[in-house]
Amino acid sequence: LDDKNTVTSQGVFYGVVGLLGLHALSWVLAHSIANTNLDSYADMLENYAWGQKFAWGSAKHPPFFAWVTGIWFSIFPTVDTAYYLLSFLNVTLGLLGVYRLAQALGLSSLALPAALLLRMAFPYSTLAAKFNANSILLSLWPWVAVAWWYSVREAGRSGWLWSVALGLLSAVAMLSKYYSGVFLLGIFLVAWVSHEGRHWFVTPKPWLALLVFGLGLLPHLQWLQAHDLVTLRYISEQGGDSGTDWRQVFKFALAPMAYWLLPWLLSAWLVAPGQPSFMQRLTGWPQRLVRCWLPQGWDDTLFWLAMLPWLITLVFGATGFVQLSLPWAIPVGFGFSLLWLRNLAAAPADVSQIAPRLRRWMIGWCILVVLVSPWYAWYQAKQGATHFYVPRREAATELLKGWEERQPDLRLRWVGGAWAENALLAFYGDASIQVVPGVPDQFPASVSPLADWHQQGGMLLCPLGPLDKPVQTDCPQQMQAWLQAHGQSSEPIHLTVASQGWRFPKRIGFAYVVFDYVPIRP
């Protein structure tokens, strides 16, 4: 009987992985069809540039997501589709964490519906395509919650191992983004709402987790000390010196309803106990939408686990402690769908009856996403959307070709200039080229300096945007001044590049200015 149950549970798990994998692959395919470039802010190129070195920090963010990017592209080719695959593998790991959390909380019947509902939320679909410091938390926070819950509940060797996992995963979350401190504060507060959680504090387990957490962060803390707390200075610049930005507070307050609108509406529509008629379901819908967010008493662990990251962030923003940013809301909703279903379901049967329907809808949704993507690509092409036509690949090819023509006996080793758009040369061109922010001997490049840069061939790249709508930038002037100060020629090299191929019916030229750095030979 035990063997039969094991086989059954394994089959269920593989089925869940298959469904979530289908979600991931459909979005990878859709983004690969609809988009001709990675994100317009070059965040993903920035990750790639940081990931070229294994460092314990940077001038902007802690390092873990850059490590992940670097390891990924040491295995996979530097193409957009591979990047989207990383993004949605991250989503799949997060949804599996939500599934496991539901099981840990004794809500196994809600596990699959909760995961399937979340895949319709924007952070797990459209926004998830951009892999960065915010989106990596989608895969980390649920597993931290799982480890915490088992550390509280399990005794003996299992409890010790889960406590080690809690400390390790918490350290990884902090090494991904310091904003995880808000989530960990929420975990600490949640532990006090139940008798089991309070008892946990008088056992050695939380202190073991804290020890592992500290050891995991120690190399990063040492790096910070050696680099004049540079990352913390960047964080402090995000503070609220100018007072509370109530517009951002209001936007962040609405984030749960905005980012998770579709699954919220759907869960309140589908889970209507008693199998009511269509009109009964419709008239009771507003009441169920409100019920989704309600606690079941002050000791409701699930409610506080789901809501505290959002609430704590909101308090920090309202008090002016930080200036809120809407993308911070991306990871906060990992427990929302589980909370909704728990509140709406009068009995497990109420949810189990909707699971088959959700599976069918999910498959249909995945098919729809893929079918819509060619239309969206055509629409962007027809409208002449600037980001659709940015010729990153073609620019990398032309820039490398031009360098070889100008400097046939000198290998290009590094590229500086406009961060992080300059990383296109390494990502789409030659992965051996080191990307530096700005110029190699000034901040922020000096935080993780490139050895012997002055003895190597380098290029300074300044994208100027489309010819008909050039961007306003002082990049060329800054690069010329730096070259002159280093005894180099500051003669600009102008380049016009356009995206090529059947996907680009319009010819929209983009301007680039480059400068060569040639080592001075004795």
Q: Language model features by range: what are they?
A:
Residues 95-97, 136-155, 162-170, 336-339:
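Specific aromatic-rich, kink-prone transmembrane helix
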Residues 114-122, 170, 174, 188:
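Short helix- or helix-capping micro-motifs
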Residues 53, 160-177, 189, 212-215:
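Membrane-interface alpha helices of multi-pass inner-membrane proteins
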Residues 85-106, 143-147:
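Transmembrane-helix motifs of polytopic, lipid-linked glycan transferases
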Residues 172, 184-297, 302, 309-314, ...:
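Transmembrane-lumen/periplasm boundary regions of multi-pass, lipid-linked membrane glycan transferases
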Residues 37, 321-329, 352-411, 418-434, ...:
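Membrane-proximal, lumen/periplasm-facing interface regions of secretory-pathway glyco-
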Residues 126-137:
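Short acidic/glycine- and proline-prone juxtamembrane loop motifs at membrane-interface regions
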